[in-house]
Amino acid sequence: MGNSSASKDIKLGYNTGYWGSGPPHGALEGIKEADRLGFDSVWTAEAYGSDALTPLAWWGAQTQNVRLGTGIIQMSARTPSATAMAAMTIDHLSNGRFILGLGASGPQVVEGWYGQPYPKPLARTREYVEVVRSILKRDKPIDHHGDFYDIPLRGGSGLGKPLKSTVHPLRKDIPIFLGAEGPKNVALAGEICDGWLPLFFSPKEDAFYRKCLNEGFAKSGEANKSDRFE
């Protein structure tokens, strides 16, 4: 997102999307060719059929350099702990090439497929990312009691205690990208994440979205965050 005009800032990604009735024909060949040609990243997606992680691990194992991203993992499909586990695992297996793309999805999928409520997506996203980052840092056992996630669960058997991942992350700062469309969600991406996965983006709206991102950068407390934000 930096203001540099050099062509080196242009990165190419290859998105396989989510599956239709089965695996997309030629996806593996396309991914291997993208890797050979020097593409920056390849991406998988999920809705209510194929998941994003399994194809990424399977196809990604046959690449060498390209970054491997989820565009997106639906937060309602997994607890923050499960997402952090998957991120650490794939990052190890890919030798530090994983990008964790997250998104809230929408009520039609969250309620209709996962059978979960769709409350306050902005606040829930903020808390979700906070928990994932805490797990990845592995500084201490997770003891988080927020509005949406209660770890360890209070009021249960009493046997649940704060835990710390047995796996040491290859990178404690695995990049987290946020799939976002609305202005508040885009600003949230700029504030708490490392990149933004836009939906229905048009270049003619660039100034509008830059304003949203800049609002988020200002709230992040990180100087010059726009220089590294993707």
Regions found by a protein language model. Give the residues of each.
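Active-site-adjacent structural elements that line small-molecule/cofactor binding pockets in enzymes
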Residues: 1-230
